Curated annotation (Swiss-Prot):
Swiss-Prot/TrEMBL keywords: Acyltransferase, Amino-acid biosynthesis, Cytoplasm, Diaminopimelate biosynthesis, Lysine biosynthesis, Repeat, Transferase
GO process annotations (BP): diaminopimelate biosynthetic process; lysine biosynthetic process via diaminopimelate
InterPro entries assigned: DapD_Trfase_Hexpep_rpt_fam (IPR005664), Hexapep (IPR001451), Hexapep_transf_CS (IPR018357), THP_succinylTrfase_dom1 (IPR023180), THP_succinylTrfase_N_sf (IPR037133), Trimer_LpxA-like_sf (IPR011004)
Organism whose genome encodes this protein: Alteromonas mediterranea (strain DSM 17117 / CIP 110805 / LMG 28347 / Deep ecotype)
Protein name from the UniProt record: 2,3,4,5-tetrahydropyridine-2,6-dicarboxylate N-succinyltransferase
Amino acid sequence: MNELKAIIEDAFENRDSISPSSAPDEVRDAVAQAIDLLNSGKGRVAEKIAGEWVVHQWLKKAVLLFFRLHNNDVIEGAESKFYDKVPLKYTNYTAEQFAADGARIVPPAAVRTGTFVGKNAVVMPSYVNIGAFVDEGTMVDTWATVGSCAQIGKNVHLSGGVGIGGVLEPLQANPTIIEDNCFIGARSEIVEGVIVEEGSVISMGVYIGQSTRIYDRETGEIHYGRVPAGSVVVAGNLPSADGKYSLYAAIIVKKVDAKTRAKVGINALLRGVE
């Protein structure tokens, strides 16, 4: 693994000289191996180690190099054709491979190569970009987008039209992370490497980036870039210091633990937030 990492790190430093026609075989092989690691889930762009998220930047660099190494090519689809550098993950899958993976992929979902989708996950007609990790039991609902290298935990529900930001465009240092047992409401957007910690519930139409104020109404504390575990979050506003205007903020209206979540439905958690 260290040798693979070293080859990719060196190639990335010299990426301007790399093209589909000029790249050394060593670099091609290293990038292909890295994408295979991501595809199988044996490698992740980010993982939680000793309670802290650690980003493996070399795998993200492998994803970026993949684009340097490939020309656009025709991709066959059921009703159409496409033209891109990155093939789709399931293009040549057999029934046996689908059964072994244990995930449901509903047409016309688009899942790019270099993506991992865990057992009992359901991918409705949506888009999952290269480098993403979608863990077991997660629902990616209709028209949701899972951005490049995003990390989605176990038993997460990404509701219809949700956007989870990627790292490639614009280039971000760290991936957006949704931890286990989270619910992200319809049309919400979580971007720019924000971490939504375990067991949180994000209501419909909440937008969170690194500069978004995440206000805890119980404590008065303001967070940036992180939704604390067990938070129930709705869209709101905070007044300016002079009281002349207000600006958008995400508001933590309550905290819940795993026991409460098990007893109470998501809709109940979002009711009575006044």
